[in-house]
């Protein structure tokens, strides 16, 4: 059975309102990452309870050259980073709005991720994050990553703090 967040993802995946497009564009512009360490292509939906976004692991990404060189797969640390960027940082930017500045500091405080399937070169993944709590500048979320077949690749809990100056 799909959770309410997954149902919302599948509905919103096919329809994105103009206000959502503007909101997600602003969030993406505020992300403190750039290529080659940006793992967010698009935000499908975002509200005060969670966020859904996508990223495609292009075949030319540098880490594939050495991570199981004869059968490259995406490293778990990169999958975790992708879930943190979409599921934690994008949601945090949405929640604090314009309080985030270039001087703001981001810190991952804890992760507990279970890896279930590999992610191969060229695969597009979807990250779905549900807020557990946001208090005292700490955001904790339940996150899951789905492959293009809607199979769960990995899932768990991620928490972090963004210090707003």
Mark where each language-model region is.
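Non-catalytic linker/capping segments at the edges of enzyme domains
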Residues: 2-73, 102-104, 120, 138-140, ...
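Hydrophobic beta-strand-centered segment that forms part of the acyl-chain substrate-binding groove
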Residues: 15, 19-21, 88-128, 153-155
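Active-site helix/loop of acyl-thioester processing domains in fatty-acid/polyketide metabolism
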Residues: 43, 74-100
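C-terminal domain-closing interface element
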Residues: 125-152
